[in-house]
Amino acid sequence: MKNELLAEIVAAYQTQNFKPIRRMFCVHEKGVDHVCPLVALAIHRGVVDRADPSIEIDGGANAALDWAAKTFGEEFTIGLLDGFDGQVQAKTDPDYVDGHELGVAAATQLLPRDPPI
């Protein structure tokens, strides 16, 4: 599943013309959408619209975060964000670890000049 999901995340950035961002969910700046992998994936799958103001909320009311937690599980989702953001693996839960590994892989591919760890 991780390889397919990584490919889908990369495709989401490419087809939607997104720029990756860390430690935030979404920032619209000068006609460019800077988004985290969860927002990229949620928009790519048609779950949320890129104009939805809730995807810019850094917290629990973020529509993309809520969707990802329901779809992939909360631990996996947190792990993915931590890995992408360059955070050290904080838990040993298998779902968290899988998400963290995917986040690191996504950051390595999408941000080659700024490796996550």
Range-by-range predicted roles:
Residues 1-35, 41-117:
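Domain-length accessory/inserted modules outside core catalytic folds
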